From Swiss-Prot:
Organism encoding this protein: Ignicoccus hospitalis (strain KIN4/I / DSM 18386 / JCM 14125)
Reported function: Catalyzes the reversible phosphorylation of UMP to UDP.
Top EC class for this record: transferase
PANTHER family: URIDYLATE KINASE (PTHR42833), URIDYLATE KINASE PUMPKIN, CHLOROPLASTIC (PTHR42833:SF4)
Protein name, entry field: Uridylate kinase
Binding site for ATP: 7-11, 44, 48, 135, 141
Length: 221
């Protein structure tokens, strides 16, 4: 049985959309029947609101974002019967809690690290074969997808993607980590972990997308 890490944008797991949270819970149960499964949840718009109200220290803003992401992870775990109800707060706790049987759901771990990076750290720790990034866009594009003429990239190397994202002039700010940050890509490269990017707004489609490998973009290590 292969091991899968599913990264879910915090936008899709929030107290403002119970049906979407419940939809993800059903998706996790479906995936668990075929894969050993760990899940990493972002902070989303709730985290960004708290971060806006936080003191100017980026470290403190990160801490607030981490706490919100853990709360989102706990919310999802409560809706998912096969999930552990304890949210790890460190890499060592991930190792202690991981058994390959129950679904392990994780939020943020430490300041300066996006939940995309956390997903790759978790993937390293549990020996995952693949990270699936269920995000707010359906794929990686050759320029910001909001711009006219943006073209979908079917496959791209992690190092090439890092250069591409740098050309977009996106900044890694607390609560504003875009698509995939450099730490996540470096971990993917060093541990040879592929990342599949898909649209996460329709969780009921994710099991078939994974089964058919119908990725928006496949990021190769």
């Amino acid at each position: 049985m292969k091991t899968l890490v599913l990264k879910i944008s915090g936008k899709f797991v929030s107290p403002y959309d119970t049906p979407l949270v419940e939809g993800y819970a059903k998706t996790l149960e479906a995936l668990r029947r075929k894969y050993k499964l760990a899940v990493v949840v972002g902070g989303g718009s709730v985290a960004r609101k708290y971060i806006e109200l936080a003191p100017p220290s980026k470290g403190l803003k990160d801490l607030i974002g981490i706490e919100v992401s853990r709360l989102n992870a706990l919310l999802l775990s409560m809706h998912t019967p096969s999930a552990k109800k304890v949210i790890p707060k460190s890499a060592s706790e991930v190792l202690e809690l991981w058994d390959g049987e129950d679904i392990l759901i994780v939020g943020g771990l430490q300041p300066g690290q996006s939940t995309n990076a956390v997903a790759l750290v978790v993937a390293e720790l549990v020996g995952a074969d693949l990270v699936v990034n269920a995000t707010t866009v359906d794929a990686v594009y050759d320029k910001p997808p909001s711009q006219p003429g943006a073209k979908r990239i079917e496959k791209i190397k992690a190092r090439e993607l890092q250069r591409l994202l740098e050309s977009f002039d996106w900044k890694n700010e607390p609560g504003r980590y875009e698509l995939m940050d450099s730490i996540a890509l470096q971990i993917a490269e060093r541990s040879k972990i592929p990342i599949a990017v898909i649209y996460g707004g329709e969780p009921e489609r994710i099991p078939s997308i994974v089964e058919e490998e119908a990725w928006g973009t496949l990021i190769l290590p």
